[in-house]
From Swiss-Prot:
Segment forming the signal sequence: none
Pfam families: ATP-grasp_2, Ligase_CoA
Pathway(s) of this molecule: Carbohydrate metabolism; tricarboxylic acid cycle; succinate from succinyl-CoA (ligase route): step 1/1
Binding of Mg(2+), residues: 199, 213
Gene Ontology cellular component terms for the protein in this record: cytosol; succinate-CoA ligase complex
Listed InterPro entries: ATP-grasp_succ-CoA_synth-type, ATP_grasp_subdomain_1, Succ-CoA_synthase_bsu_CS, SUCC_ACL_C, Succ_CoA_ligase-like_bsu, Succinyl-CoA_synth-like
Cofactor(s) demanded: Mg(2+)
Name recorded for this polypeptide: Succinate--CoA ligase [ADP-forming] subunit beta
EC number: 6.2.1.5
Binding site residues for substrate: 264, 321-323
Note accompanying the cofactor annotation: Binds 1 Mg(2+) ion per subunit.
Length: 387
């Protein structure tokens, strides 16, 4: 689960992590009122959406007087903000964060995340803050520190010293940053986060470190332990189809392609998407129907993916282990009773009750179903149908 910048900063402040003063606004008048209340002569007017790249998309502006606060707020509030993380459809800006300015001497990048391959918590830090960290990693890898932490040991001084060394901090600056990272690490662990990112982390003229931005992502499976975090969920920021799918036990993520995928198992779903890409087509979604799929959930999956007007072909790839292939076949028939399907369906069914499933589909009057003999053949069929 993701939360907004202003919510993340409130959590930071409650845990002793320095942030600039700021207030959320839901209208232009409230934005101006907040700026007056905060005082000063410089304010940041920030769009609050669950996506990065807001600045490049025009969603973050620096105002040097109240008239500019009003002007920027009126332009940003209600805009459809498109960034590299929103996709071409963008996100509607429904709230702003008005934040006091700061005397910035240097910008850094700092993140804490879980490295599944190494089975460690990893701190990523860079002296190049406020930039795309992937670009920095590609062009200047020496400017990035990657420090692995064994969760059984936790964050120690030597971890922080390595970060401070790569960032080029002096002794006093290093002490301040290490203290901040220790608090962030504890917060990351205590709140069951998947990712914590500050970009940029700033150093002021006074030598203090502040989180100028804040992104926090939490483990959905652990939210029952943190009702105070669960209350921060903003469902207006979530894809309606993804939210509906979750209510039916389906794992669905919308993508930008034109080949809809319906698969059982996350690993097979990823492999299916890979081979679709390899064939030259583009997947329109990730969709895992899970091991307990019923005809009803399969029908719901059909209903959801067919709402995507970009979809030209549906690729159903099922390996019957826990889920039986005949259930999937019956689900396909159930779906076509309630939803008109005018696009081709490529089906690859293997495993438990695959023969029965084939019989069910063969005996149906569905004329737009094509059977695939294997995964590669399925991808080739999909590509030929997409064109």
């Amino acid at each position: 689960m993701n939360i907004h910048e202003y919510q993340a900063k409130a959590i930071f402040a409650d845990n002793g992590i320095l942030t600039l003063k700021g207030k959320v606004a839901f209208s232009v008048d409230e934005a101006v009122s907040n700026a007056k209340e905060l005082g000063g002569s410089v304010w940041a007017v920030k769009a609050q959406i669950h996506a990065g790249g807001r600045g490049l998309g025009g969603g973050v502006k620096i105002a040097k007087n109240l008239d500019e606060v009003k002007d920027y707020a009126s332009k940003i509030l209600g805009m459809n903000l498109v960034t590299h993380q929103t996709g071409p459809e963008g996100k509607l800006v429904q709230k702003l964060y008005i934040e006091s300015g700061a005397n910035i001497v240097k910008e850094y990048y700092l993140a804490i995340l879980f490295n599944r391959m190494a089975e460690q918590i990893t701190i990523i830090a860079s002296s190049e803050g406020g930039m795309d960290i992937e670009k920095v990693a590609k062009e200047s890898p020496g400017k990035i520190a990657k420090v692995g932490i064994d969760p059984q040991i936790g964050f120690k001084m030597f971890h922080g010293l390595e970060v401070a060394r790569v960032l080029g901090l002096d002794k006093d600056e290093g002490k301040k940053l290490i203290s901040m990272i220790a608090k962030l690490y504890k917060l990351y662990m205590d709140k069951d986060m998947n990712m914590l990112e500050i970009n940029p982390l700033i150093k002021t003229a006074e030598g203090d470190f502040y989180a100028l931005d804040a992104k926090c992502s939490f483990d959905d499976s652990a939210l029952y332990r943190h009702p105070e975090i669960a209350e921060l969920r903003d469902i207006t920021e979530e894809n309606p189809a993804e939210r509906e799918a979750a209510e039916f036990g389906l794992s669905y993520v919308k993508l930008d392609g034109d080949v809809a995928c319906m698969v059982n198992g996350a690993g097979l779903a990823m492999a299916t998407m890979d081979i679709i890409n390899y064939s030259g087509a583009k997947p329109a979604n990730f969709l895992d129907v899970g091991g307990g799929a019923s005809p009803e959930t399969v029908a719901k999956a059909f209903e959801i993916i067919l709402r995507d007007k970009n979809v030209k072909v549906i690729f159903i790839n099922i390996f019957g282990g826990i889920v039986r292939c005949d259930r999937i076949a019956n689900g396909i028939l159930e779906a076509t009773k309630n939803v008109e399907v005018n696009i081709p369906i490529v089906v690859r069914l293997d495993g438990t009750n695959a023969a029965e499933a084939k019989t069910i589909l063969d005996n149906s009057n569905l004329k737009n179903i094509k059977a695939a003999t294997n995964l590669k053949n399925g991808a080739e069929l999909v590509k030929s149908l997409v064109g």
